[in-house]
Regions:
Chain B
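Generic, well-ordered alpha-helical scaffold segments in large soluble proteins
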Residues: 115, 119, 218, 222, ...
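Conserved N-terminal diphosphate/IPP-binding helix and adjacent helical/loop segment
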Residues: 1-108, 112, 116-120, 125, ...
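C-terminal intrinsically disordered extensions
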Residues: 2-31, 181-219, 305-327
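Structured alpha-helical bundle/scaffold domains in large eukaryotic membrane-trafficking regulators
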Residues: 121-124, 253-256, 260, 296, ...
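Primarily interfacial, aromatic-capped hydrophobic alpha-helices that serve as membrane anchors
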Residues: 142-171, 271-316
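Active/binding-pocket-proximal capping segment
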Residues: 236-242, 251, 255-265, 322
């Protein structure tokens, strides 16, 4: 790591190196949601400023490449409703995601996918010059906090600890006899080697 | 949205006879045009501060500036920082330092992505498109060169700066990618040669509209925490206009490189661009909320339109330089 290279850049680039260490190729993060948006109940035409139901015959051919899928109609979009298909609340749907649960499963998946590698990297990094510098910096930061800020930080850390314990418990209960890491082996939640 | 802003002598829109019958309210006055110039000068300095450490850390060879590439990157990022300013205020948010940096990073990201697609030959173009699609579908990007390392570092910083899984932002990113791919296929494929002229022009016009229309939406998504749906059409219109203005300014260099655009294929490009400009500005002015962001966007577009007309005129005279106009 060069002196001017931000820590975030190093982490991002190191994460890419993990790809070759997976036993089974799995995505890191999927930004592509083309399939889901193509099936969304409403399509907002940004070229013509018109809100359609999915599949409306009034969508101009020139607008096909400028459509945004919507699952609900925001209040400000009602003014743009297509007079042909008259999109309304009756077709509203939930987006193919489930809010907080997605985050929990996301965390579980990262721990499962990279747990051992992250731990190994963390150990290496802690013992490196940069890691020692960061540790010193964090200690200094903690020392300089006001009492109230320290108390707040402690609450956050305790909450995080509780959350991680809950996640571990959830993981065990979800796991119950079946593997969720996709390679047929029982999940080790980062304890085993993922060579 | 993919070429640097060239800036030239300041003139008001009225001096070019740009009037809309029955409504001239949109025309920026000389103070608004001067504000654009002032902001550009300030952002030019800020962009260097924002980008140089990353370039030095990941791709220091770029600082040697072979072929003026680093300067072009700074110019594009400056333009993107300014357009980001307008977009952020249009969306109703103050353009603070962090948001300005996001605008700058997005400019740098666009410049590098364009270079992957334009500068290394057809095989590399196809391969880069595949690798960028892999990045979008899996998050994996196999970093092979310092240029790619810089690109990935910038992309990851942008992705960390905003909730990239926001439904509008992620769709805008994918729509931009699809537009870029269609544009590339159009350039690299043979099908274009057999198209009837009318169809060809429609295709080229839509391609230009989509590339920059979606790019400005992505930019807005990175500078503003939220985009109201009603703002998407006027922002898309602003982006499309920027692309047409760009294409007119780059007309001769594009033709030299065999790159067809709507504006270099129509019979009377200057008159066509003038008509497009007036139509788009009228839609923008009517569709955007009346605030400082709208005024800045209109003033920038007017300034940009005038300077690119000038660039086109100059390049017609000395058609040996693709980047003839710099301040």
């Amino acid at each position: 790591m060069s002196a001017a290279e931000p820590l975030g850049d190093v982490i991002a680039l190191k994460i890419q190196e993990l790809r070759g260490r997976q036993s089974t190729a799995r995505p890191l993060v999927r930004i592509d949601n083309r399939e889901a948006t193509a099936n969304a109940p409403f399509q907002f035409d940004t070229a013509e400023a018109c809100l359609h139901r999915n599949g409306c015959c009034a969508i101009p051919s020139g607008s096909r490449t400028a459509l945004y899928g919507l699952w609900q109609i925001p209040p400000q979009a009602r003014a743009f409703a297509c007079p042909t298909c008259r999109p309304g609340d009756d077709d509203e749907d939930e987006m193919a995601s489930d809010g907080v649960k997605d985050y929990v499963f996301g965390m579980l998946s990262v721990l499962d996918q990279f747990g051992s590698v992250i731990r190994e990297r963390g150990r290496e990094f802690r013992e490196s010059a940069e890691g020692r510098e960061l540790t010193a910096g964090l200690d200094g930061l903690y020392r300089n906090l006001e009492d109230r800020e320290r108390a707040t930080l402690q609450v956050v850390l305790n909450s995080l600890d509780t959350l991680l314990s809950t996640v571990a418990e959830l993981d065990k209960s979800f796991d119950g006899g079946r593997s969720h890491n996709g390679n047929g082996a029982a999940s080790r939640n980062g304890d085993g080697g993922h060579s | 949205m993919h070429r640097p802003a060239a800036t030239g002598p300041s003139r008001s829109a009225a001096s070019h006879g740009l009037t809309l019958s029955g409504d001239e309210l949109w025309q920026p006055d000389s103070a608004q045009i001067e504000r654009v110039d002032e902001l550009i000068r300030g952002y030019r300095r800020e962009v260097v501060t924002g980008l140089e450490p990353s370039v030095r850390a990941h791709y220091p060879e770029l600082l040697e500036d072979p072929g003026g590439e680093y300067r072009k990157m700074l110019e594009l990022s400056t333009k993107m920082t300014l357009v980001g300013h307008a977009c952020c205020e249009i969306a109703g948010y103050p353009y603070d330092e962090r948001r300005r940096l996001n605008g700058t990073l997005f400019g740098c990201c666009c410049f590098l992505a364009d270079s992957f697609i334009d500068d290394f030959g057809p095989d590399a173009t196809r391969e880069y498109l595949e690798r960028i699609e892999l990045l979008l579908t899996t998050g994996w990007f196999d970093v092979r060169t310092p240029r790619e390392e810089l690109f990935y570092a910038i992309v990851s910083r942008l992705f960390a700066a905003r909730d990239v899984l926001d439904p509008i932002l992620r769709q805008a990113i994918l729509l931009l990618f699809e537009a870029q791919r269609r544009d590339t296929e159009l350039r690299l494929g043979d099908a274009i040669a057999s198209l009837p002229r009318r169809e060809l022009l429609t295709l080229l016009r839509l391609c230009a509209r989509d590339r920059s229309g979606h790019a400005i939406t992505v930019l807005t998504g990175f500078v503003a925490p939220e985009i109201e749906l009603s703002l998407l059409p006027p922002l898309f219109t602003a982006g499309a206009l920027i692309m047409h203005i760009d294409d007119h300014g780059d007309c001769f260099s594009d033709l030299r490189h065999g790159r067809l655009t709507y504006l270099n294929q129509v019979r009377n490009p200057a008159a066509t661009l003038r008509r497009i400009f007036l139509e788009h500005i009228a839609r923008l002015h009517a569709g955007l909320p009346a605030n400082d962001g709208r005024d800045l966007m209109v003033a920038f577009l007017t300034r940009y339109f005038l300077t690119r007309l000038e660039k086109h005129r100059l390049e017609r005279k000395r058609s040996d330089s693709a980047w003839a106009v710099y301040e």
